[in-house]
Every structure is written in structure tokens, then in C-alpha cells.
Amino acid sequence: MTLLALGINHNTATLDVREKVAFSPAELEVALCALRESGLAEEVAILSTCNRTEIYCETGAEAQHLLVWLAEHKAASAQELQHAHYARWGDDAARHMMAVASGLDSLVLGEPQILGQMKSCYAVAREAGVLGRGLHDAFQRVFAVAKRVRSETAIGENPVSVAYAAVSLAQQIFSDLKQDTALLIGAGETIELVARHLKNQGIKKLIVANRTLENAHALAKEFAAEAILLADIPEYLPTADIVISSTASQLPLLGKGAVEVALKKRKHKPMFMVDIAVPRDIEPQVGDLADVYLFTVDDLKEVIDENKKSREEAAKTARTIIDEGVERYQLDQRALSAVELVKDFRQQTEAVRDQEVQKALNALRSGADPEELLLTLSRNLTNKFMHQPTTALKRASSEGREQLLQDFKSLFGLD
């Protein structure tokens, strides 16, 4: 089995392709179990965010077979995924996972949310019972590296995230947010960050819409906002100058018709909308309306690029930490190989012991002399344990394999 990281991200695939293979939280456990039951992977975890879908697994299968599984499971185009995917094996897979968890492979360099998403990916796989020793150890090494990157570099300073970029873009369109109302759809971590950034910029009013009023109230309370249900959005939409949405819905929440009605009530006063969700919460056709500025996560890239430079020096140090992490991972894997070898050796020797002891017990019950039995048992065990190594040594000697002979001496402490 070998560690594999296979997936697509914002660098390799458009939003249209990414949303086709995005997994909602409710889908993940079913997908994890389905993949393991397919026989393609012994251990598996799936990371699915707005910017990437990645499969991490211990597998003996070809990457192409897992790519076909992903396409079939999500009813996506295998040809599209073929052009957009990447596959990393072994040490390269570990390096990739470390870079992802540290924020070095994110749309926003150094963004902190990805580590939490990676930990959630690990937790879901653990709860689903599809993690084994190999993938567990890989994740632990990944988390240790990401923690070092956060604590030993400035990669997380000067907050830059999709949420920050969305608010920065809003400021470019509405220079003063103190007179504006923002409608936030969702109540997750990204929306919480958006709310915090908007509050820091002095937004006049915040409205939080969510599928459950309880979650909306929890966020609204923290930011002195108004909490509403998703069903109430049409009523409140005309009051919103800014709409930012990030939910896990599999279907759009805002259509062109609903926005047209809101614009009429606003007397066509412009609306700024950012759809951070994958799949999208806002129908793309909404962007065709003359008085709407609609942006997606891909549109935020330009804003984000301007803020990358301050983190690039820190990223160099982070890559050095990742190099060290990969070396430690290699040592972990070698140690794990030794553990498996010792386990197999012990099972083999215990099987021989059990067989010989059973023979001795049978002879004892038949009235054999105990002292003679002990001598016979010890002789048989010695011969059985010596047979395979002795045969291998004779063969190595006849073939001139001196290094194996020297290794044998070292292994058994023979001078």
C-alpha cells in the first residue's frame, strides 16, 4: 500500500468543474465507505472545500482507477477530471498534504481555515472507520508540520482570506460601508469571518440568514445582527446593499427572478453579491442583471493576489519546515515497515512454537519422559528457527553476497 493524494483545485479546475465533484458534509461518510468497499483503497479520507476536492488514501490501485471512481460517484465527466486532476504518491503525497494544511497551496496564501478543514476531514474518516495506521500517522505528521508553520513563521499575519477579499471588494464598490446593510447567507466559519471583517469596517446593519434559526441566532448575537430563516430572504433582500453567501446547499438559494423583484423594490439601487459557495448559492444568471455586481470565489483571485506578497517570505521558511516534515515522515514509514516485519516474524515464530509445544504435550500425555521431552522440544525449536536463516546464508555465501553475511553478523551480534 502507498499513500496517494489525488484531486483537483482552484489552480487546475474551473469553478464549474470543482462544484461537480464537491461533497457536502452529509455525503462524505457514504462516499468514504463506498470507496473502501470498492476495493480501490484500504484507508481513505476526503477533503472537500470551495477550492478543492482531494482524496487521501493508502492504495495499491492506479490513480486512474480512483479518478474514474470519483467521476462515476459524482456523475461527473471523466474527461474533464482527466485534464484537471493531479496525483501525488508516497513522500510527494505527504509533502502535498503538508503544503495544503499549512495554507501554502491555498487560493489565499497562508489562510488558516484550511487546517481546520483538514482536521475535520480526518475526523470524519476516523468516525466512518476508514482510517488505518498508515493514513492516521500521515495526518498526525501533517498536523505537526502545520502547527510549526503557524507558530514559527508569519504566514498567518496580516489576515488575508476569501472572506477578507470579499469585504475588500465591497469597499471598492461602496467606499463607505457605514451606510450599508449586508445580508449574510449561511452561518459557518467563512460567514463568521465575513461578519467580523464587515463589523470592523463599520457596516451599518448585518442580517444573518440560515436554514436553522438557532445557528443564525448564535452568529447574530455575537455581531449584533438580525437572524432570519432562508425562507425569509425574499422579504429582506430589497434592504440589502451587500449579499455574501456561503452554505453547503446542493441547489442555488437565490435565483434571477427573486433578485429582479428585489431590485425593483430598491428602485434599481445597485447590489453587490459574492457567492463563496461551491456548488454556487446564487444562479450565475443573476450576474446578467444591470444593477448587480456578482462575484464568485474565482473572481476574488485578483484581490487576493495583491495581498500574497507579504506572505511569500514566510512561505519560504514554511517550505523548509515542510522539507523537515517529509524527512520525519520518511523515518516514520521506515519504522512502520520494521514494525510490520517484526510482527510477521513474531507470528511465524509463534506458529512454529505452538506446533512444537503441541507435539510435546501430546507426547507427555502418552507417557513420554518429561526430561527427554524438554530436550527434544528445545532441539526441534532450535532446528526450526535456524533452518531458514541457515539456508539463506549458505545461498548468499555461494553467490558471493558478502554484505548480507556482514549484515547477518551485525543483526545477531556475532563477532
Swiss-Prot record:
Statement: the UniProt record of this protein carries the keyword Oxidoreductase: yes
InterPro entries listed in its UniProt record: 4pyrrol_synth_GluRdtase (IPR000343), 4pyrrol_synth_GluRdtase_dimer (IPR015896), 4pyrrol_synth_GluRdtase_N (IPR015895), GluRdtase_CS (IPR018214), GluRdtase_dimer_dom_sf (IPR036453), GluRdtase_N_sf (IPR036343), NAD(P)-bd_dom_sf (IPR036291), Shikm_DH/Glu-tRNA_Rdtase (IPR006151)
Residues noted as binding NADP(+) in the record, renumbered to the chain: G186, A187, G188, E189, T190, I191
Pathway note: Porphyrin-containing compound metabolism; protoporphyrin-IX biosynthesis; 5-aminolevulinate from L-glutamyl-tRNA(Glu): step 1/2
Marked site: Important for activity: H96
Catalytic activity: (S)-4-amino-5-oxopentanoate + tRNA(Glu) + NADP(+) = L-glutamyl-tRNA(Glu) + NADPH + H(+)
Active-site residues per Swiss-Prot or TrEMBL entry: C50 (nucleophile)
Pfam families reported for this sequence: GlutR_dimer, GlutR_N, Shikimate_DH
NCBIfam families documented for this protein: hemA (TIGR01035)
Role played: Catalyzes the NADPH-dependent reduction of glutamyl-tRNA(Glu) to glutamate 1-semialdehyde (GSA).
Cited HAMAP family: Glu_tRNA_reductase
Complex and partners: Homodimer.
Protein name: Glutamyl-tRNA reductase
